Regions:
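Non-catalytic cap/lid and distal C-terminal segments of serine-dependent acyl enzymes
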Residues: 1-317
């Protein structure tokens, strides 16, 4: 018997002071009828203040309906940052790609371009260390070896966005800073686990360039070391600072986590962050800008498509 869909509902006050709803769709693990394709984009970055030109790459997913000749159709772009120990190839495997295909094959979600990035400098080096601890050179500020400027937020804006969005049919008119800001309504950033930490960090540093955010299964470190203690005031200030500085810019944060056996510190932060005066909790983008969904999942990057099935029903609307 085929597994059935189910809705996981927590009323206000049960976990956080707001209700949470997560739609579990087992079809994400099915066989898609409509399939997209992946393309690799190679680029260089010089943003790390070390005098070096680092070669890097990302993987771009083009949905089944993407037509390079149709220049009139402009696609929204969702960036994905993987978790600790992983790499940008995580969803390019046969099984991984199927789960991405199934998000859009459902017919319930507007197809978008997806970009799979990495904060690691070179995923082909020190592979065993990366896959074991994840502690290899990286630009997101979470490399234990130190000595690297935490400038991945610059790499995304200065190098990745133009490399991807000027190649495909997107809302980016040219590579200027003004054009990147002007097209923010068509751009989102998301990530799982350490990639969620990176998503909060992108919101903090690149708010003028991204309208939508989908952090999955991890809290913000508020710019502090991963294992440091942080107060609710520090967390709230870190997240809301760019929003207050650019109060004219609309946004939506769709955060997700597993419960009760995933990243508990994220759920703890969600008990107070949505109460900040810059937020309106709910799923209606016309009047809300923050939502938190709780699945029953364990912790692994491969579950991200199930979270996208929820968040992409709200983001880009």
């Amino acid at each position: 018997m085929a597994e059935e869909r189910k809705t996981i509902f927590h009323p206000a006050g049960e976990v956080i002071d707001f209700e949470t709803v997560f739609e579990y769709n087992p079809d994400i693990a099915g066989e898609p009828e409509k399939t997209g394709q992946f393309e690799r984009i190679d680029y260089f970055t010089e943003v790390y203040e070390d005098g070096k030109r680092h070669p890097k790459y990302c993987n771009v997913y083009l949905p089944w309906c993407y037509d390079p000749e149709d220049r009139e159709k402009k696609y929204n772009v969702m960036y994905y940052q993987h978790g600790n120990t992983c790499d940008p190839d995580i969803f390019t495997t046969e099984e991984g790609k199927k789960t991405i295909d199934c998000i859009f094959d459902s017919g319930e979600i507007e197809p978008c371009i997806m970009v799979f990035t990495t904060y690691y400098f070179d995923v082909t080096k020190d592979i065993e260390i990366r896959k074991t601890t994840g502690d290899v050179p990286a630009g997101d500020g979470n490399y234990g070896g130190g000595g690297i400027a935490p400038n991945f937020y610059r790499e995304i804006v200065e190098d990745v966005i133009p490399a991807v969005e000027l190649r495909y049919n997107t809302g980016l008119a040219d590579g200027s800073d003004e054009a990147k800001k002007a097209s923010r309504d068509h751009r989102g950033f998301s990530g799982y686990s350490r990639g969620a930490v990176c998503t909060w960090y992108i919101l903090h540093n690149d708010f003028e360039y991204f309208r939508y955010y989908a952090p999955m299964s991890c809290m913000t470190t508020a710019g502090l070391p991963l294992n440091a203690e942080r107060t609710p005031e520090q967390v709230t200030e870190y997240i809301t600072k760019p929003i207050k500085e650019h109060s004219e810019l609309p946004f939506f944060i769709f955060a997700s986590n597993g419960h009760p056996n995933d990243v508990a510190p994220m759920t703890e932060q969600m008990k107070y962050v949505p109460k900040a005066d810059v937020f309106s909790y709910g799923k209606d983008p016309e009047k809300n800008n923050f939502y938190f969904a709780l699945s029953e999942f364990r912790h692994t990057d491969m579950l991200a498509p199930y979270y996208y099935y929820n968040s992409l029903k709200v983001l880009f609307r």
